Design a protein with these regions (language model features):
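Flexible, acidic/Gly-rich N-terminal and inter-domain linker regions that tether
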Residues: 1-113
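Conserved Radical SAM active-site core
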Residues: 103-121, 125-194
Length: 194
C-alpha cells in the first residue's frame, strides 16, 4: 500500500472504525479507547495511544495516517479573537477563527467560544464581500482536515492556558469556502464531531 492510499484515521466514522477493529481481531472496547485518544485526549500521533498494545498501534500506523494541520500563524491571543492560518500537506492553507462570546446577560464575562471553520481551499462563488474566492476554488477540504482544525485549536488553547478541557461551545462553517459545496466531506465531519 502506498502512503497516498492510506486514509487519515480522523476521516473514518465510528462504524468504519468498528469494522476495522473487528477485522483486525481486536475486542470491541478498543473502538472507545481509540476514539478517546483521537477526540478527548486529542493526540497528534498514533504512538501516543499508550493504553493500546504496541502491535495494535503498529497495525493502526500501517492502516491509517494521522495528519495534523501545521500552525503557520496566529493573530490575537488566548483571551481575544484569535485567527489561525493552517497549512495542510501539499502546502494548501486555510483559516479558522476562535471568537469569544461578548459579555453575558448580567454583564459578566461569558465562557462561550465559537470557532469559525473553513471547508474549502479557496471558493468558487466569488462573493464581493469575501476574499476567499479571489483566487477561485482550489479544492475541498477532506473530512480529517475539517475535523483537524477544531482539534488543533483546542490543543493550541490548552498550550496557552494549561486548560486541557474542551473550550469550543459552538461551530460555524463560515471560514474559507462554501460548506454545502463540500457536502460529501462536511456531513461526515459533523457526524464525527457530534
Amino acid at each position: 500500500m502506498k502512503d497516498s492510499d492510506i486514509k487519515d484515521i480522523r476521516s473514518i466514522d465510528v462504524s468504519g472504525l468498528k469494522d476495522w477493529v473487528s477485522s483486525s481481531g481486536q475486542p470491541e472496547y478498543r473502538v472507545q479507547q481509540i476514539l478517546s485518544w483521537l477526540y478527548k485526549k486529542r493526540v497528534n500521533s498514533l504512538d501516543e495511544m499508550t493504553n493500546l498494545p504496541q502491535s495494535l498501534r503498529e497495525s493502526l500506523k500501517n492502516s491509517f495516517s494521522l495528519d495534523v494541520p501545521k500552525l503557520v500563524r496566529v493573530q490575537g491571543s488566548k483571551d481575544t479573537t484569535a485567527k489561525f492560518l493552517w497549512e495542510f500537506g501539499g502546502g494548501d492553507m486555510v483559516e479558522s477563527v476562535l471568537i469569544p462570546a461578548n459579555l453575558g446577560d448580567g454583564g459578566d464575562q461569558s465562557n462561550r467560544k465559537t470557532l469559525c471553520v473553513s471547508s474549502q481551499v479557496g471558493c468558487a462563488y466569488g462573493c464581493k464581500f469575501c476574499a476567499s474566492g479571489l483566487d477561485g476554488l482550489k479544492r475541498n477540504l477532506n473530512v480529517h482536515e475539517i475535523v483537524g482544525q477544531i482539534i488543533a485549536v483546542e490543543n493550541w488553547h490548552a498550550e496557552q492556558t494549561g486548560d486541557f478541557g474542551p473550550i469550543i461551545n459552538n461551530l460555524v462553517f463560515m471560514g474559507m469556502g462554501e460548506p454545502l459545496a463540500n457536502y460529501k466531506n462536511l456531513i461526515p465531519a459533523l457526524a464525527i464531531l457530534n
